[in-house]
Amino acid sequence: MSLENLSCQKSFGGWHKRYKHHSDVLGCDMTFAVYLPPQAEQGGKLPVLYWLSGLTCTDENFMQKAGAQRMAAELGLIIVAPDTSPRGLGVPGDPDNAWDFGLGAGFYLNATQEPWAKHYRMHDYVVQELPALVEAHFPASDKRGISGHSMGGHGALVCALRNPGRYLSVSAFSPINNPMDCPWGQKAFSRYLGEERSKWREWDACVLISEASEQLPLLVDQGDRDDFLAVQLKPEALQQAAKAAGHRLEL
């Protein structure tokens, strides 16, 4: 699969690059950003952190604003940031042009309902297609970590819990912990997955943690003055689920 380089900037001795490619999984062209630390030019394979951004974001937000490249350069760590949804001609968005569903709000799941099912398969893209592409074109090893913020934090937790052995670490900043029980999640799940709540359980970290076959420790960072804390994020739900399952969680 070919890559088209869209931009390239020197950063902390390495390179911050942006690429476009066609995704067979999503049925559209996608962009992603990658940081290649200085060690990428020295030979050998490097570990990769996949970063999943939140609602309304693109592949550029974290890579342009977070400043994580400095630490990645020190650690010899590749960072890969995909977009937050499929985009482009023929990809449906929210019929009301809302910001919390559709374009920029793919929720890192595999939609089953029309018209979303054809394109909104962000889970398979993030877990399977994108890493295969990255490992084919860059000096990236199969030592993977995954992290994210808000909707992306939800995505990181779900990707790790659903795919034992796929990641060596998982962490999240202010994640949507219990999407089945918050307005953002309920809106997205009802449209992407339908009204049958039993199908929602497959994409909720609080449910998945009780069924996890791998005890991969979870690291969650949450500010106690977050405006969305009580209604949307619900870290206490994840804490209770982890305690009940005996799953290690640092919150």
Residue spans for each PLM region:
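Non-catalytic cap/lid and distal C-terminal segments of serine-dependent acyl enzymes
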Residues: 1-251
